[in-house]
Amino acid sequence: MDQEPSERPLPALSFRHVDPHAYPQGVAFLDGQFVPMSEAKLSVLDYGFLHSDATYDTVHVWEGRFFRLDLHLERFFGGLEKLRMAIPFDRDGVRRTLHDCVALSGHRAAYVEMLCTRGASPTFSRDPRDAVNRFMAFSVPFGSVADAEQMRRGLCVVISDRVRIPPASVDPAIKNYHWLDLVRGLYDAYDRGGETALLLDFDGNVAEGPGFNVFAVKDGRLATPAAGVLAGITRRTVFDLCRETGLSCEAKAVSPADLRQADEVFITSTAGGIMPVTTIDGAPVGDGTVGPLTTRLKDLYWQRHGDPLWSTPIHYPQ
């Protein structure tokens, strides 16, 4: 039988937290210091943790080069402005910080994040104006939404009935950590034998998935949802590649039926690039194999990673 609080001695108060968890190898920056990922700590009183009051952006490094870094910086600073947050760095300062995280980590292929939380209030006030905004960054090994086997055969996607948070509530242009709708959609997909999920908008059209946009190909023409979605950098890159190669690509309403009847479907994310989808709700997309246009765009996408107009080199220590 448990003792009453008045009958048992209090536990000892520790003055240093010992973290038993494992973390990926990498380097983080916070409070002016570059530290191993295992030492990158956030207060439990930070509103970023308590209220998901934060914005972030993620850029990847491939073969020692950032890909489209300026576009990610532009989106990150746009989110800061909309959320009325301020950090002690301009874009060049953030660029240098991200570079140094990668260079110190030694990663040639990396997932690199910049983020700002609302921070903590010294008095635990609920007024967000009292909080001290906190900027952080980190570099960890590159990861993909789709693994090598899924890239080869294509992903199995389930269209969840969950509705994505509408733009009237949270501007999708602000990259954020409001993922509970996406996480519930993922569990819907797992329960139905899928590997990842797509959510709907309030009109019943397809919106986006957990960290990715989606494209449908029909009769050689591409379409991607226009409303209520993050304007992903990889999504934008697909538009750029289509423009260069003369392919038709349009942002418009895409219904679940449009996806199911498409010749090809693929998803796009910084975490993986252009990734094929060959099954939706248990039924094959087209002939059930990775489509030629998806393959063509995927190959072009990775080829552009060495283009100095689209990429920035990392200067690693000798």
What are these regions (language model features)?
Residues 234-235:
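Secondary-structure junction motif
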Residues 198, 205-226, 231:
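Glycine- and Gly-Pro-enriched alpha-helical subdomains that act as flexible
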Residues 1-198, 202-205, 230, 239-318:
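Conserved alpha/beta cores of soluble small-molecule-handling proteins
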